[in-house]
Amino acid sequence: MLKLAVFDFDSTLMDGETIDFFAEELGIGEEVSRITEEAMSGRLDFFESLQLRVGLLKGLDYSIVEKISHNLPYMNGAKETIAELKSRGMKVVCFSGGFRTATSYAKDILGYDADFSNALHVKDGKLTGLVGGDMMFNFSKGDMLVRLQNILGISEEETLVCGDGANDLSMFAHAGSRVAFCAREILRKEANIVVETKDLRIILEKI
């Protein structure tokens, strides 16, 4: 019986990439989006890509970051899927290589129990181009999942994970149910549940 569900945020619980929305404000959307795609497809190290992309955001007003973070388009069925999993007695957690401004705000709207993500450094009301946090490396999600499983006394077989990109691979290594959601090929190959339609409720039919 499943007891824990861990969802990625960008392009999984949320329909898009938070950092790409930020970049559009600075007129560098295409450049940042290209780096994001390289990282999510596994062609570029996630840590390097994160530093590179956040560096390009230097000088962006934090008020704009907050406004965008609070108006993101959530994925079809996100709220309903989380509510249903919780009604089955599961803990639902969000792991994101993105940013706390988005995941913490979404927590209250979508209803997951906890979020682990990264923090954008801010000085004098503007982004400094630096980032820190729990989810900065390719191995971060896997490491955090193992820690959570140990704390909660939950096994791999009792764990469901859901994501779309290469930085989700490490958590796929520690879960019995592995959902590739509208995912890159590198992740699809490691999944035992594949969803190709942008509606998270489809997962409920498959578990």
Walk through the language-model features, giving the residues of each.
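Alpha-helical substrate-recognition element adjacent to the catalytic core
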Residues: M1-A119
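C-terminal cap/substrate-recognition subdomain and adjoining C-terminal extension
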Residues: S69-I207
